[in-house]
Amino acid sequence: MFAGLPSLTHEQQQQAVERIQELMSQGMSSGEAIAQVAQEIRATHQGDRIVARFEDDEEE
């Protein structure tokens, strides 16, 4: 699977981590917090995007 992902600076990545930790401290699960922050980044990010390939590691 290929996806256009926002290209974030180290500072932006750190801000995302801090936001996730803040949401978790308010009682949100880690999965929900990550999903919410990812959605926020996609909605507000302006800048370059990277192309990433995700492979399924599980053998069927």
UniProtKB/Swiss-Prot annotation:
Signal sequence annotation: none
Pfam families per the UniProt record, alphabetical: UPF0181 (PF03701)
Top-level taxon of the source organism: Bacteria
Alphabetical list of NCBIfam families matching this protein: PRK05114.1 (NF003476)
Family per record: Belongs to the UPF0181 family.
HAMAP family: UPF0181
The protein's name: UPF0181 protein ESA_01442
